[in-house]
């Protein structure tokens, strides 16, 4: 009746896992108890969990990202600790099978369940406001996308206490991910978590492309959109083009595992190299899906804190377009050693090097924007300056790896690991943390505490260099990745330094949590009264902080890129309208939540081969969608009286500051 699920699926013999489960259970009970004690369940359900407001969905995305950052970093510091100890006769504290699961979970969580939701959350928060829209094109799909992410993240975490996670590495190459070598449920957890979250991401990409192309405010031409909106648009083009490839690759792997087919097994006509091609045809665009919005954040932050118009706006747009196109032409550099031949390797090596040109254009444009600007050294600009140095190093090592001959020497070594983290942490993560500090007051109405923000930045920056620069050296010394034990005593000092670097990054994360606590405690002193704490230049700063649920009482008229800056110069930024018109808005819905719950049931049942429960989940998903499709009560009009009340309260608040 319960398929492969038995009591033996609970890892009683793993003390680390059981202690972790106990801690998580206690924290969960504490949260549930607090919500119950303060009687907030109704508020959470009506205002947040069923909301289709893009701003609230953005906040929830970021909450999930921060939770998964803690989970993914816990895996990282455990690996660093293991490698600092496991030399010679000392085998460390993690058994190999547990280490391999942590190794896989870290990559999957940090890329799919931390970086992606962080990026999507910031995109939800800022893009509709930046283009003067009242919401996204498909508010219900936005809610559904979020809840699909949540349930897929839950599947990854459920694997901690029921069964196991994949031991394949985050790429899950065959034949290791095939049934013969991974007969347990770990790879199935991997497949269904990525399939469900990938569907949500694809819906997000479609949603935001339609939003940007069809819902810009009157007068805003494409070449008048903020750079962040542009980079998110290019990222969404990559999402729509690449995520179906991942869906297909994992679908074929599922057929191999569930129906004994042979797409990726060498016997009976299969080819493991086809999976590797398909995976990286998605995987390399995924890197640019993560980095392009971060580039947009750095552009917004640089222009704002330098007090200048962005240098080379058009070249920034075209550079983003070039990166988007070239990002689809370089996937083979992930497996130069697979035997494609010198001509093929040479083509992809040159294409990889070419990406450094538009990236360099962006870097010089940021520097020229800062040049002769009156730079204010708040936390967002510190993350930006840290990125410029760190990402440049990562880019140079990437150009080195683009040379096939050098890659043959360094492939699969820790040099590659250092390069990847150099670009993703130094680029994407630093960008998201800059955006988090930058747009936090817009979401919550008060700024983050600067003192703790700067402490976090310095811990992250110094910790990053301590954690990953030694890995470049270890790569040259011949240390390969995926090791849980080694015999070379010369490697140990570098791995110990890397461990202490990870500890410093932990201090940075702790400082961010303290920063949140201190900021909430001191929110009255840190209040953003006029909605423009940074002297912003784009339309999101024209609203109150947080913005009203309809965003704009009247859609703004735009003539140029820095629309809000122009309004302030013209004296029209804070103009109260004599009368208001009704505003068309979507109603909240629980349909996204219910469809995602059934998707979780479907995925869990598929993992454990509980076929009747899988049918329940499938019928529930389809049924919920049909019910939603026939529901005509999905929108309403905000009446002028309500708008007048909200806007009058805002202008009274502004008048007190004059």
Swiss-Prot record:
Its cofactor is Cu(2+); heme b; Fe(II)-heme o. One of its GO terms (cellular component) is plasma membrane. Gene3D superfamilies: Cytochrome c oxidase-like, subunit I domain. It is a multi-pass membrane protein. One of its GO terms (biological process) is respiratory electron transport chain. Fe(II)-heme o binds at residues 288, 411, 419. A ubiquinone binds at residues 71, 75, 98. Belongs to the heme-copper respiratory oxidase family. This is Cytochrome bo(3) ubiquinol oxidase subunit 1. The gene is cyoB.
